Amino acid sequence: MSFRGGGRGGFNRGGGGGGFNRGGGSNNHFRGGGGGGGGGGNFRGGGRGGFGRGGGRGGFNKFQDQGPPERVVLLGEFMHPCEDDIVCKCTTEENKVPYFNAPVYLENKEQIGKVDEIFGQLRDFYFSVKLSENMKASSFKKLQKFYIDPYKLLPLQRFLPRPPGEKGPPRGGGGGGGGGRGGRGGGRGGGGRGGGRGGGFRGGRGGGGGFRGGRGGGGGFRGRGH
């Protein structure tokens, strides 16, 4: 589920079905580069309706800290640390997708950090959390639960292909704030370091395969070099 910035107007429609990035092949890694259509149901192929390169206006601006929300809902469970970040399995209702840079909380609404990367398969994905300065990755327990403001979630259908014959504005770009810069690429692994079907994440920092959203400004997944 490697989202690259660039372009206007939402999410790229390459060949293949249901992928989230540009790469080719049908194994379920998030890797940049490559040619051809991605395999169905992963977060990297240039699939129709995936989280491709398209950024676009009107969605995912950089969050500003505004204190805890009125209520929080379950976002995911702690899997393992990765450098100074943590990797979590997403367990949201109906597989909703968190905005990039959305604040992540404990059940008591204490903020621990922000969503940094999202990766894995379409209906079985993971996310990493960039921890706040006062938080340590080693302080969390396996399967510890984390929470999010329900208004910082998007329906998975936003990123799926539109049924044949359905009319309406293109899916993807959407309105509303949220998001911000994307992740960095670089070997997160879904539920375990490295590759594998659980959502391996390939590509160096900022390379082919990282969420490359722009830093603030203009909304959308911004292009390279921002």
Swiss-Prot record:
Q: Where is the signal peptide?
A: none
Query: Which Pfam families does this UniProt record tie to the protein?
Result: Gar1
Q: Name one GO cellular component term.
A: box H/ACA snoRNP complex
Q: Where is this region: Disordered?
A: 1-66, 158-226
Q: What's in the keyword line of the UniProt record?
A: Isopeptide bond, Nucleus, Repeat, Ribonucleoprotein, Ribosome biogenesis, RNA-binding, rRNA processing, Ubl conjugation
Please, one GO biological process term?
snoRNA guided rRNA pseudouridine synthesis
Its family remark reads: Belongs to the GAR1 family.
Read off the PANTHER family from this record: H_ACA RIBONUCLEOPROTEIN COMPLEX SUBUNIT 1, NUCLEOLAR PROTEIN FAMILY A MEMBER 1 SNORNP PROTEIN GAR1
Q: What is this protein called?
A: H/ACA ribonucleoprotein complex subunit 1
Q: Which organism is it from?
A: Rattus norvegicus (Rat)
Give the gene that encodes this protein.
Gar1
